């Protein structure tokens, strides 16, 4: 199952990040650029670093100047995340370019790469909820509540595995077709963000 392969790469990325747990640590992607897993690993690494950016910026004692700098790093990370999704969709467009789409084929509400994006974020939720469910210094009540949440996340993972694999099978069989829209991020574009383009005057 393609979804489980992707998830195993996401888990590896998360595990590798937490060896040092530092948002500034360099990535050491174990896959070559020719492998699809390289994109998956990089995608999740970006997600994992951003997850920890979001933790840091919520510190009530954060220095305002540091918070502004971090907010800009988060914006840049969001753009990277979107770019990676588009790279992954490009892979699938190429992979299924030979498929003869059936006349009655339908379009899906999201592309394969955005489904994998959700799976990547879900892997992070599961990792951190599992940490909380097993945190020794936490109260039993806290651990029990986190275990209940973890069980729901694991059920969601099973459902998402099925949904992703069904989608890929449908595309491969011509029952569904891919249509990818380049994400029109506006806040980083000085031609589209009013604050930025007014500032240029």
Regions found by a protein language model. Name each.
Residues 1-201:
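Anionic, Ser/Thr-rich low-complexity intrinsically disordered regions
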